């Protein structure tokens, strides 16, 4: 049942991915073929099944429909089922499903358009903080900070979890602000978009301090590896531009960093605990 619900949400996410970056309504008009713009009948809009029955083509113009549509539906469904398997029945699973929905959407919109819409990130920040109170998570990061500062611990797990979420959102946004400022001072150009600030704040609100630190660590590593592999495997003229400097030409590649924030946050959501335990094992 949860898999089917995930397919439906994945289908809706496809609408968001296609329309929000173009500033179009996600309610009207009804779904249309991206090529001939013919309205898609309900029988041709069943997640995955319709795409398979039509062999990935529009019923009207017979042009190919992107494989992205069934893949997004399947991916969201898999994340929903994985969330239930990992967290069990409860608010935490609902929180994880919502987080996966938002993050998958942001990853694909950033990859396709370089746009991280406020329609996803701003409500995501508020929802992350709300769920922190409804489904208190592991606030060990905040407890460590409070102990180091010799400050009292807030009464009750809900308050502790909420403050942990707010602190993580502020930490995520602050990290990118200082990274943006440092890059601008050195290079005199913007290296991080403001959408990344909001996305990182949203991730912090959902994951809390401990896992947000893991995302801050993982995302630059993944981004750097991607940039290096792209430069090594592709024609430099297609992925970079030369910029003069004191040492000669510097090769700069455009990297959609929201993609790596999203991937890192999903890794942290499902594998963050064993990764932290592995890391802390070196100090025992």
Task: Put a short name on every predicted segment.
Residues 21, 230, 234, 271-280, ...:
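Membrane-helix cytosolic exit motif
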Residues 13-69, 248-249, 257:
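Membrane-proximal soluble regions of multi-pass membrane proteins
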Residues 85-95:
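Transmembrane helix-loop-helix
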Residues 7, 11, 15, 81, ...:
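Transmembrane alpha-helical segments of multi-pass membrane transport proteins and ion-pumping complexes
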Residues 194-195, 232-267:
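Interfacial loop-to-transmembrane junctions
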Residues 56, 75-81, 102-104, 197-204, ...:
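Hydrophobic, membrane-inserted alpha-helices
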Residues 32-35, 57, 143-158, 238-249:
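Membrane-interfacial, low-structure loops and terminal tails that flank and connect transmembrane helices
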Residues 2, 98-228, 278-284:
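Functional transmembrane core segments of multi-pass inner-membrane proteins
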């Amino acid at each position: 049942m949860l898999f089917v619900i995930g397919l439906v949400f994945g289908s809706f996410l496809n609408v968001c991915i296609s329309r929000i970056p173009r500033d179009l309504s996600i309610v009207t008009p009804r779904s249309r073929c991206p090529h001939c713009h013919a309205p898609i009948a309900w029988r041709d809009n069943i997640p995955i099944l319709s795409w398979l029955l039509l062999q990935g083509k529009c019923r009207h113009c017979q042009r190919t429909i992107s494989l992205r549509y069934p893949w997004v539906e399947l991916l969201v469904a898999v994340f929903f089922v994985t969330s239930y398997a990992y967290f069990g029945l409860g608010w935490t699973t609902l929180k994880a499903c919502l987080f996966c929905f938002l993050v998958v959407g942001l990853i694909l919109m950033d990859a396709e358009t370089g746009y991280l819409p406020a329609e996803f990130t701003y409500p995501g920040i508020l929802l992350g903080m709300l769920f922190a109170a409804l489904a208190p998570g592991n606030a060990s990061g905040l407890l460590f900070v409070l102990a180091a500062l010799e400050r009292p611990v807030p009464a009750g797990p809900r308050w502790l979890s909420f403050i942990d979420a707010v602190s993580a959102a502020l930490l995520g946004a602050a990290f990118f602000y200082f990274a943006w400022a440092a890059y601008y001072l050195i290079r005199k150009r913007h290296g991080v978009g403001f959408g990344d600030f909001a996305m990182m704040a949203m991730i912090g609100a959902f994951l809390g301090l401990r896992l947000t630190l893991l995302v801050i660590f993982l995302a630059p590593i993944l981004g750097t590896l991607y940039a290096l592999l792209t430069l090594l495997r592709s024609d430099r003229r297609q992925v970079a531009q030369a910029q003069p400097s004191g040492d000669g030409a510097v090769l700069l590649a455009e990297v959609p960093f929201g993609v790596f924030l999203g991937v890192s946050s999903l890794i942290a959501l499902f594998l963050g605990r064993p990764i932290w335990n592995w890391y802390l094992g070196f100090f025992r």
